[in-house]
């Protein structure tokens, strides 16, 4: 009985540790993702040009650029 309880406790602890590791952000970058150089500025994302099909134009509310 004692051995069974110990196994259950170990199983629960390992599940809790795995869930905590999954939820917390990783301190180390994943090897599959390329890391930007330290001196490199972040890329500037330009808004997509918006093509209005219906009125009122949704571009006015979202702040996109009209063509």
UniProtKB/Swiss-Prot annotation:
Q: Where is the composition biased (Pro residues)?
A: 31-44
Q: What are the GO BP annotations of this UniProt entry?
A: defense response to bacterium; immune system process
> What is the disulfide pattern of this chain?
50-59, 52-57
Q: Which domain of life is it from?
A: Eukaryota
List the keywords (alphabetical).
Antibiotic, Antimicrobial, Disulfide bond, Immunity, Signal
Q: Which residues constitute the signal peptide according to the record?
A: 1-25
Which parts of the sequence are annotated with region: Disordered? 22-44
Subunit text: Interacts with chitin through the N-terminal region (26-48). This interaction may be important, since chitin is a component of the fungal cell wall, as well as of the crab exoskeleton (permitting a possible action of arasin in wound healing in case of lesions).
Listed name of the protein: Arasin 2
Q: What is the lineage of its organism?
A: Eukaryota, Metazoa, Ecdysozoa, Arthropoda, Crustacea
């Amino acid at each position: 009985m004692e051995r069974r309880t110990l196994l259950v406790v170990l199983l629960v602890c390992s599940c809790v540790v795995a869930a905590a590791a999954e939820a917390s952000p990783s301190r180390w970058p994943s090897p599959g993702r390329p890391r930007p150089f330290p001196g490199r500025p972040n890329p500037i994302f330009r808004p997509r040009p918006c093509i209005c099909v219906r009125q009122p134009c949704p571009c006015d509310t979202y702040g996109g650029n009209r063509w």
